Swiss-Prot record:
Acidic residues: compositionally biased ranges: 896-910
Domain C2: from-to ranges: 691-811
Listed Polar residues bias regions: 541-550
Primary gene name: Kibra
Family that this chain belongs to: Belongs to the WWC family. KIBRA subfamily.
Coiled coil spans: 201-229, 335-463, 1049-1076
Domain of life (superkingdom): Eukaryota
Region (Disordered): 1-60, 541-560, 841-870, 890-913, 942-972, 1253-1272
Protein name: Protein kibra
Species annotation: Drosophila yakuba
């Protein structure tokens, strides 16, 4: 046997005998080759052990290839093969005989570092990507066929909507021509007052409205045409993919083709990246041109006024996050850091919870179903509007044929609407409810990300070395089974903000669906006369002149009863001001208590007031259970908003506002009527001022004397705060500058609670720099005999005070009933303050000054921070506790060292720890976090050996032990008098070996490396991340082909967008140079253009851009999280449905400048010649004939559709109709020229064309059908039109 092997090896070397079917070999890295060879060696070693019981047949031998692969030699037939001849005895013959993960004879599973696992069929000498044991490919083909059938129905709905809107355009055109004719007749008869039936001004207004209606309908036709072409192109792509896969043998790609497709996808991705840069540059230039056009228009209207684009907002020029951490001293800084960390952790948990809820919610939503429901509902509304137009037509001037056609069309529309109402049942409402819940979760997620971003910036401000991130670094969503870094994942291809258009307003869509269903129920219970039905429908639906577009269907919020669907939960989750520090979301705002003595009336709650209420509720949560210092929170003297806690209960219960400041009033008034414009804006509800308690305060600063003049003038409606229980009750005002004010000023006491007039002026000596760190607190105090009671307070931040001007303003008073333990906020009188100062001076004569200065410095720093964060002043209760602790613990904390420098440092440390201890006294968890941070702070003072070092034990246990602190200099002295049980000194020097994180480092140590700081706290990836690979079904050939076509589609539309943007840029530049007012007005007023440039507006704040990036990252994380929930071995149906729906979703639309901004305006005043009037007659007649022809054609088409409905064949991909050229199939100019920039042309990729889509450059302006020759020669008689009083 050995001689036979040697002979075989010599024969092979001489004749170059190689296996007939070699595996594809790629040039890989040395490490990847070793792993692959090791896996193959292990597999064949196990196989050899399994075959060791059976000897090789006669004439067979074993050999190894150059890469270590074992093959077998048949010396009898002089052939080589990879198949072991003993497999016929050990392996099953067919797939039906396989058990578990077995493969039949002739099949082998292999692995490629770039592609991942694939399968080799040695019998057919082929390779494939799919696992032959799974039926996933068949399921995918069936899902593709079902979706194409549903997409065909959706396309038919779009085409039917196009036909209905085109009929509306014809009727609008006829109305415009009729009005134009009436205006010309009125101008001709203007000399005779008896012949003039109508006012020329009214005719001119009606003519303008009709022209706007025609223009609006043409724009809507353009949108529908684009939607149809986009859907057709997507369906053509899916058809071509299905036919290409079916044309392959076994419907699978081999490994060489898979590798080629992968390389092509990477090349297309590079082209996409470069093209996106070009698109962003074009959009930025469009923003500049739009701003320039706006400046020109404003300068033409009023050259004296300055342009708003040149104004800079100076409302807040302070970086709140960056300066808050620097202004705090040691103790307060760590207290704020610990509090912020807890809040940050709570928000992170809330974000993870929302992501999990969104991942669970996606499984209940069918991809692409929302678009179909939207088209179905909009089609119903279009038919309603067409029916209204037909009902408004006067039949007296019509011929019998026209009357018959109009009656038939009305009957057909009524039948269609009846069927549509029945189809729009509870299932559609439930689906829309799921989408509305998803939108609500997305809104919550956006608010959570915004709050987390603010907390993240605040944490970064505390320490420059700290870096926080809310994005996960794991790559769980990669669909490459080999996890190659260069592979494109599902999120890279199908989650693109520019690949889809603006999202659908699900709330508005659901309201429309509910309205249609309710209207159908009312019609079933109470049949209505057609005319009355028309009037009721007109009240709900918009008029033909509405600003309805396919992207953002408008609807008046008053029409759908916006407050009916609101819940108290929506009120609790109201977003607050952006500059307020967010609170953990688990907080539930307590219901406000109505004030006794105030008459509760059902006022409409203003949205600004609602924002204030939610701001106060979240500020309560910030203090972590401590009494809220709302008394120290000044109210803005500019807005003068009332306190939300003083609002009646009925007013709060009737609130239905949302986060939008342009809220909708719940009362129906003349101002809430939207009319025919489709634009709605409700007036704000004005709260009565007499229900609020107010105080008038004047402020003026004298720089030369250094004195603040405070004038307490008068008050108003103090009975809202307190009801006098006796006749001898009096009221006075008391004021003080906080913090640490030992004196206070007060006015005289008056018995008038309704409108007391004090007129007291006081001078407070204070320097200007200290004044800006203070807050003026004014309290309202009542006296009944010898008893005094504080009933309200006002606080004014002096940081906003302008010392150059004198102010006299009204301030709202916050009631003391809503502040727990309000007595502790009482300001000490002059005598009490003097006594407290005397006690402090007698108890601590030596160190009292230093302590008072340190405490004052800390509180002033806290006051500065509160001023920067807009009216979050420190609590007086906290200051009093700090002062009390200083007086009591002062002698005990005196250092026992003779060194004066060390004494000062130790006193400063004691003060810092004391301040922070008092601030964290409210929560045990916060106290533990603070003590931990304090230990790290004192332990990590780098290498300063002269600094006093506090012991490890807490201060509460220090009385039982030696209280002397351990100095770093004494730790190196053998004679230091320090007990052994207390000796614990850590020297963590910065950028040294001892600063490394305790534990096993995942990386090798490199001295002087730049990335050492990040290596210190490097965390290992969780084990669950590494186990996620190879748990799902790998990609099939259909998946691969869909990914490739998706990349090509994105590149095609990107090139189309670039071409349109370039054309738009050139037109706007010429208009800017020529100062064209029409183009400037279009650029400023067009909503679609405004949405487009808003994406790349450089004036957009960086926080919003970062928030959009975080939303994109979160969307990818949600997809990854959802994929991890798919059981092992089960197909991901939702992801595949999202893939195929990607092709029919409308992308980002670039607006096109209309060729004619307005129709030619008729001049009803000037006289025209008779020949032009006759031309108008004939044009009107031709339009009427065209309308009749279109109605008959639409009726025949609907009849054919009802008789021959579309049914797609199941189990196979539907065939394409005859190819017809469309504008969608014509490639646009491609600025990004690459070899793979154009999609792969296939014979099956023929577009599906709609009969309604014209090949004209402007399909929206569909040409009116030409009348027959008989109709042109028909003679028309003049008939008096009773609507307009003219002959037609």
């Amino acid at each position: 046997m050995p001689n036979l092997q040697q002979t075989a090896s010599q024969s092979q070397s001489q004749h170059h005998l190689h296996p007939h079917h070699l595996r594809p070999h790629q040039q890989q890295h040395h490490q990847q080759q070793q792993q692959q060879q090791q896996q193959q060696h292990t597999h064949h070693q196990q196989q050899q052990q399994h075959h060791s019981d059976f000897p090789l047949p006669d004439g067979w031998d074993i050999a190894k290839d150059f890469d270590g692969k074992t093959y077998y030699i048949d010396h009898i037939n002089k052939k080589t093969t990879w198949l072991d001849p003993r497999d016929c005895y050990t392996k099953p013959q067919t797939f039906e005989d396989c058990v578990g993960d077995e493969l039949p004879m002739g099949w082998e599973e292999s692995y490629d570092p770039n592609i991942g696992p694939y399968y080799i069929n040695h019998l057919a000498q082929s390779t494939q990507l799919e696992d032959p044991r799974q039926e996933w490919k068949t399921v995918q083909e069936q899902m593709l066929s079902d979706y194409l059938s549903a997409a065909q129905d959706q396309l038919e709905n779009k085409r039917e909507m196009f036909d209905v809107k085109q009929q509306r355009l014809l009727w609008a055109q006829e109305e415009y021509n009729h009005l134009k004719l009436a205006a010309s007749r009125s101008s001709l008869c203007s000399s005779s007052s008896s012949m003039s039936r109508h006012d020329p001004e009214l005719l001119r207004a009606d003519l303008m409205l009709a022209r706007e209606r025609v223009h609006q309908l043409k724009q809507e036709l353009t949108h529908i045409t684009n939607d149809i072409s986009y859907t057709e192109r997507g369906m053509n792509t899916l058809y071509s993919v299905g036919e290409k896969i079916n044309a392959r043998e076994n419907g699978c790609y081999d490994i060489a083709e898979v590798q080629a497709i992968r390389e092509e996808m990477l090349k297309v991705h590079k082209s996409l990246v470069s093209g996106e840069k070009v698109r962003e540059e074009l959009m930025r230039s469009l923003v500049q041109i739009k701003n320039e056009l706006g400046r020109q228009q404003i300068s033409e209207e009023n050259s004296d006024l300055a342009s708003p684009f040149d104004r800079v907002c100076v409302a807040s020029q302070t970086d709140l996050c960056g300066s808050s951490g620097d202004n705090l001293n040691g103790g307060a800084r760590f207290a704020e850091m610990a509090k912020t960390k807890l809040q940050y952790a709570e928000w992170r948990k809330h974000i993870k919870k929302l992501q999990q809820q969104l991942a669970d919610h996606v499984e209940r939503i069918e991809p692409g179903q929302l678009e179909s429901d939207k088209d179905r509902i909009l089609l119903i509304q279009e038919k309603e509007k067409l029916l209204n137009d037909l009902n408004s037509i006067s039949l007296k001037s019509r011929s019998e044929e026209e009357k018959r056609v109009i009656h038939q069309t009305r009957h057909k529309l009524e039948e269609d609407l009846k069927e549509a109402y029945e189809a729009n049942n509870t299932c559609v409402a439930n689906r829309l409810r799921f989408h509305e819940e998803k939108q609500l979760l997305l809104d919550k997620l956006q608010e959570a990300l915004k709050s987390t971003k603010l907390l993240e910036e605040r944490l970064k401000s505390f320490s420059s070395e700290s870096t926080f991130s809310i994005s996960s670094g794991s790559s769980l969503g990669s669909l490459s089974t080999a996890s190659s870094k260069s592979a494109l994942s599902f999120t890279d291809i199908y989650i693109d903000p520019f690949a889809v258009d603006s999202p659908i307003d699900v709330v508005d869509l659901r309201r429309r669906s509910q309205r249609l269903f309710q209207q159908h129920q009312q019609q079933r219970l109470h049949p209505v006369h057609p005319v009355l039905q028309q009037q009721q429908s007109a009240e709900v639906t918009l008029s033909p002149r509405s600003s309805l577009s396919m992207e953002t269907p408008p609807a008046s919020p008053m029409k759908y009863n916006a407050g009916a669907d609101q819940t108290p939960q929506a009120l609790k989750e109201e977003p607050t001001y952006a500059n307020a520090l967010p609170a953990p979301p688990a907080y539930t705002a307590p219901p406000p208590v109505p004030i006794s003595g105030v008459r509760a009336r059902p006022y409409d709650l203003d949205s600004t007031v609602l924002d204030c209420m939610m701001l106060e509720a979240k500020l309560q949560k910030l203090n972590m259970g401590t009494p809220l210092n709302l008394a120290a929170a000044p109210l803005s003297p500019i807005s003068e908003k009332p306190s939300l806690l003083d609002l009646p209960q009925e007013m709060l219960s009737r609130s239905s506002s949302t986060s939008n400041t342009r809220s909708v009033s719940a009362a129906v008034s003349n101002e809430s009527v939207a009319g025919d414009s489709g634009v709605f804006e409700a007036s704000r509800a004005h709260l009565p001022r007499k229900e609020l308690a107010q105080v008038q305060i004047g402020l003026k600063y004298l720089k030369q004397e250094g004195v603040l003049v405070v004038s307490l003038e008068r008050a108003n409606n103090l009975l809202a705060l307190w009801t006098a229980s006796a006749d001898n009750s009096q009221v006075y005002l008391r004021a003080a500058l906080l913090p640490n004010s030992l004196t206070s000023i007060r006015t005289k006491a008056l018995g008038d609670f309704q409108k007391p007039v004090f007129n007291d002026t006081f001078a407070v000596p204070i320097t200007l720099d200290k004044l800006l760190t203070k807050s003026l607190q004014v309290t309202v105090v009542t006296m009944t005999g010898q008893k005094e009671e504080i009933i309200g307070t006002v606080q004014i931040s002096m940081a906003e005070f302008n010392p150059e001007d004198s102010t006299l303003k009204w301030y709202n008073v916050l009631s003391s009933k809503f502040i727990p333990s309000f007595e502790s906020l009482d300001i000490p009188s002059t005598s009490a303050a003097a006594a407290a100062a005397a006690v402090a001076a007698s108890n601590a004569p030596n160190s009292g000054n230093n302590r008072e200065e340190s405490s004052d410095e800390s509180t002033i720093t806290s006051s500065q921070t509160s001023t920067l964060t807009r009216n979050q002043a420190p609590c007086m209760e906290l200051q009093e506790q700090i002062a009390a602790e200083l007086l009591e613990l002062g002698p005990l904390n005196e250092p026992e060292c003779s060194d004066d420098d060390d004494d000062d440092e130790e006193e400063e440390l004691d003060d810092k720890q004391l301040v922070s201890d008092v601030g964290l006294m409210n929560s045990s968890g916060m106290l533990d976090a603070y003590l931990q941070n304090m230990k790290q702070e004192f332990a990590d003072k780098e290498t300063n050996t002269d600094r006093a070092y506090l012991p490890e034990k807490s201060r509460g246990q220090s009385q039982l032990m030696d209280d002397r602190p351990v100095k770093r200099s004494q730790t190196f002295t053998p004679s230091a008098a320090v007990s052994k049980n207390r000796y614990n000194c850590r020297l963590n020097r910065s950028d040294s070996d001892s600063a490394m994180h305790c534990g096993v480092a995942p990386h090798t140590f490199q001295r002087g490396a730049a990335e050492r700081r990040s290596l210190r706290f490097h965390t290992k990836a969780p084990k669950s991340v590494t186990k996620l690979h190879h748990t799902h079904i790998p990609r099939t050939s259909l998946d691969l082909e869909l990914d490739l076509q998706a990349q090509h589609s994105k590149l095609y539309f990107l090139n189309d967008q670039i071409a349109k943007l370039q054309n738009l840029k050139e037109v706007l530049q010429k208009a800017c140079e020529n100062k064209d007012p029409l183009v400037a007005a279009w650029a400023i007023e067009n909503e679609e253009f405004q949405r487009l440039v808003a994406r790349a507006d450089p004036a957009k704040c960086p926080e919003e851009r970062q928030l959009q990036k975080l939303l994109m990252k979160t969307a990818k994380e949600i997809h990854k999280l959802r994929k991890t929930k798919v059981p092992k071995g089960c197909p991901d149906l939702v992801s595949f449905k999202e893939k195929i729906t990607f092709f029919t979703r409308k992308g980002l639309s670039v607006p096109e400048l209309p060729s004619e901004f307005t129709l030619p305006e008729a001049n009803p005043i000037e006289e025209e010649e008779e020949e032009e009037d006759e031309d108008e007659f004939y044009n009107s007649a031709e339009t009427a004939i065209a309308i009749n022809t279109a109605l008959v054609a639409s009726s025949n088409r609907n009849k054919n559709l009802s008789e021959h409905p579309h049914r797609a064949t199941s189990g196979a991909v539907p065939k394409l109709p005859a190819p017809v050229a469309t504008p969608a199939a014509t490639p646009a100019a491609t600025p990004v020229a690459t070899p793979v920039a154009t999609p792969v042309a296939t014979p099956a990729a023929t577009p599906v064309v709609s009969p309604a889509v014209q090949t004209d450059a402007k399909p929206a302006a569909a040409p009116i059908p030409v009348a027959s020759s008989d109709a042109e020669q028909q003679r028309f008689d003049y008939v008096v039109d009773r609507n307009y009083g003219v002959e037609v």
